[in-house]
Design a protein with these regions (language model features):
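N-terminal membrane-proximal hinge/A-helix region immediately C-terminal to the signal-anchor transmembrane segment
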Residues: 2-119, 127-129, 133, 153-160, ...
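Cytochrome P450 proximal C-terminal region
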Residues: 6, 71, 158, 347-349, ...
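Cytochrome P450 I-helix active-site segment
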Residues: 34-40, 151, 155, 200-212, ...
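Cytochrome P450 catalytic-domain helical core, especially the substrate-recognition surface
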Residues: 38-65, 87, 112-187, 200-265, ...
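Conserved cytochrome P450 K-helix E-x-x-R motif and the immediately C-terminal K′/meander segment
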Residues: 52-75, 254, 258, 353-396, ...
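Conserved cytochrome P450 catalytic core segment spanning the I/J/K helices
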Residues: 143, 244-324, 363, 431
Length: 507
């Protein structure tokens, strides 16, 4: 009897982990032929092989190198592999990418930190009517006329912060700048003295998210645990590191909750006329909506949503922009001639200490430089992985419910089909009239595209130009010859270590 039970269990394992995923892969291979590359792995070792390769190579280290090499060799439309029984399909063809991005309601974004109390209710990961409501509430704050009013504040923060710039941790210094800009401009909190675990609040939020997201790459056991148990994985045989991270999350949420509660009390103590005329930053908008709710249970859920929205927007506005700036500084250090050309432009177009909104439009070379960095080393190199919520088709590609879908537009950014000398860094390509070949408007999409594109793209570019302009006015940027660099995945795709460049004051 026992032997038959064992046979049944082994048969089930064989079906789930081998026959089921392999059958789907073979069907796709038969349908698309050479346009579909497949790689069956029993425990989804593909990603871990990439990590191993990234660690063992030298200064060209990049977690995506293997995928870029495979794409350039085979020119496939889809790359299909598996994580246990789950199919993961990476879409490389821009026409299929376009369809997937336009039909976003057929997917749910996968939360890289896999934790219910941090990002799941924020704008980036919410879905359906909740997402539409959040996007509508917040969209006016990202319109260009509203952003222009923030230019003096961005200059002031940048100038005060770069005076204390640390070459020991350049990325952290940049996070301090971008995070304070977000806190003051979008949450109306007029202080940079909120500390937690010996770090500024904005830096601690970024550190927590990056460390939690990176946990999934620490070992195959960690990744498999998340895949099977989802958000409950943090409480199943937690390691010491996981316990420490969970405590930091609790401490951080407590501080954010206090900030939200203070704003609620301020509104409650204010008369209606004052509420109507108060500056409409994100926190005020969200709290105003909260105060319209009379049901206590719904109020508690909304309070938690405000905390998560705060964390989501604070992190998105802090880390991604800071990592982009860090990448720009690295390429400026690698290409000193380009650095000098752009510095000359900044000093010519922006002669005063502040860089104003009218001058920003004249910084053509700086804009082109940022575009080239985004083409080659975008912090959001691969958009957030999506899981299909229903069976559907992308053109003639059948996607089944539960499949993981990756939209790998970074492959097109470095393809000779669309860019001359695609593997070379050449910011001057963006000074030409038509830098992109065979463009369907979904080739170069550094901030994604479609209805769920990055709501903060204009803000990120505005910040990047002002902060880089201010740094170029005051500092010479060189590479740190004492470190070896690599391009890793934490939450974003980012340069490591955090002191790969050195800023020297211009005398």
């Amino acid at each position: 009897m026992i032997i038959y039970v064992l046979y049944a269990v082994l048969g089930l394992i064989l079906y789930l982990f081998v026959i089921k995923p392999l059958t789907e892969m073979i069907k796709l291979k038969f349908q698309f032929g050479k346009d579909c590359k497949i790689s069956f792995t029993f425990f989804g070792r593909e990603i871990f092989d990439q990590l191993k390769e990234a660690k063992e190579s030298k200064n060209t280290r990049d977690i995506f190198n293997k995928q870029k090499t495979a794409y350039n060799k085979y020119q496939y439309k889809f790359f299909v592999t598996n994580m246990l029984w789950i199919i993961r399909i990476s879409i490389a063809d821009p026409s299929y990418q376009k369809e997937a991005l336009l039909n976003h309601d057929q997917y749910q974004k996968v939360d890289p930190v896999c934790h219910n109390d941090l990002l799941s209710k924020g704008l980036v990961w919410s879905k359906g009517e909740q997402w539409k409501k959040q996007r509508k509430l917040l969209s006016s704050s990202f319109e260009f006329d509203a952003l222009k009013k923030k230019v003096p504040m961005i200059n002031e923060i940048t100038q005060s912060k770069i005076e204390k710039f640390s070459n020991e941790n350049v990325l952290s210094s940049l996070q301090s700048i971008t995070g304070l800009i977000v806190i003051k401009s979008f949450f109306g909190i007029q202080t940079d003295q909120i500390y937690i675990n010996n770090s500024e609040l904005q830096v601690e939020i970024a550190n927590i998210m990056n460390e939690m997201a990176y946990m999934r790459f620490k070992s195959q056991i960690q990744s498999t645990k998340r895949l099977i148990f989802g958000t409950k994985a943090w409480k199943i045989f937690p390691t010491k590191e996981e316990k420490r991270l969970l405590q930091r999350v609790k401490d951080m949420r407590s501080i954010v909750g206090d900030l939200v509660q203070q704003r609620i009390k301020y509104f409650e103590d204010s008369n209606n006329s004052k509420i109507n005329t108060i500056n409409e930053n994100f926190l005020n908008i969200l709290v105003n909506e909260y105060l319209k709710i009379t049901n206590k249970q719904q109020q508690e859920a909304t309070f938690d949503q405000i905390i998560q929205e705060f964390i989501t927007l604070q992190f998105a506005g802090t880390d991604t922009t800071a990592v982009l700036l860090y990448h720009c500084l690295y390429f400026l250090a690698c290409y000193p001639q380009a650095q000098e050309e752009i510095r000359v432009e900044v000093n010519r177009c922006c002669p005063s200490s502040f860089i104003n909104e009218n001058e920003i439009n004249n910084l053509k070379r700086l804009s082109a430089f940022i575009s080239e960095v985004l083409r080659l080393k975008n912090p959001a190199m691969r958009p957030i992985i999506r899981v299909a919520t229903q069976d559907h088709k992308i053109k003639d590609l059948q996607i089944k419910k539960g499949w993981l879908v990756c939209i790998d537009y970074f492959l097109q950014n470095q393809s000779e089909r669309h860019f001359e000398n695609a593997g070379q860094f050449d910011y001057t390509r963006w000074l030409q009239d038509n830098p992109i070949k065979d463009d369907n408007n979904f080739i170069y999409i550094p901030f994604s595209a479609g209805p769920r594109n990055c709501i903060g793209s204009q803000m990120a570019l505005l910040e990047a130009k002002i902060i880089l302009g201010q740094i170029l006015k005051q500092y010479q940027i060189t590479r740190n010859g004492n470190v070896e660099v690599s391009w890793e995945i934490h939450f974003n795709h980012q340069l490591s270590p955090t002191n790969a460049v050195i800023l020297n004051k211009i005398k």
